Amino acid sequence: MIRLLYLLVKPAGMSDETFRAECLRHYEMSHDVPGLHKYEVRLVAEQPTDTHVPFFDIGHVDAIGECWFKDDAAYATYMASDIRKAWFEHGKTFIGQLKPFRTAPVAGDEPAS
């Protein structure tokens, strides 16, 4: 499984309500994207600082998105899709900045991708 995680920041001046609505619309649009196994977006409700290890600040984050792909072939299908390209165009309308990460498992049978 390939998993991509995104830290998302809304554009300056966009209301929380508009950002929430566009996140929901983006989630709903994700169901039609070829090769995309699962998409989830969650709004950041709080950024606690009372951690059990030293805290480091990454700046303000409004939401966290994650995309799942079954394998490299599914990811290639996703990348080539015109529907995915249109989905990304929608993302440009409500995502001011993002920071992507491709993650890898620490245990289990799933190979690091």
Swiss-Prot record:
Give the source's domain of life in one word: Bacteria
Characterize the pH dependence.
Optimum pH is 6.5-7.
**Which sites bind 4-methylmuconolactone?**
H26, Y39
Q: How is its activity regulated?
A: Inhibited by CuSO(4), N-ethylmaleimide and p-chloromercuribenzoate.
Recorded E.C. number(s)? 5.4.99.14
Question: Is this entry keyworded Transmembrane helix?
Answer: no
What are the binding positions for 3-methylmuconolactone in this chain? H26, Y39
**Recorded GO terms, molecular function?**
isomerase activity
Which family does the record assign? Belongs to the MmlI family.
Q: What is this protein called?
A: 4-carboxymethyl-4-methylbutenolide mutase
